[in-house]
Amino acid sequence: MTDYTATAICEGDHWVIDVPGVGTTQAETVDDLEDMAVDLVTAMTHTARQDVHVELRIV
């Protein structure tokens, strides 16, 4: 399993999620943050979802 740290920042009516070394994505709600971060990592690294762990930090 590969560990990543994502940072989420509220920007108006949406959230911006940054995963260093991977990329940036956005989400509409707090409930979507972790799933969107994991989706970003799996898409950009071609890694299976079960092999990814994302620690989410909301700032």
Feature-to-residue mapping (PLM):
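Short aromatic-glycine-(Arg/Gly/Cys) micro-motifs in beta-strand/loop hairpins
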Residues: 2-19
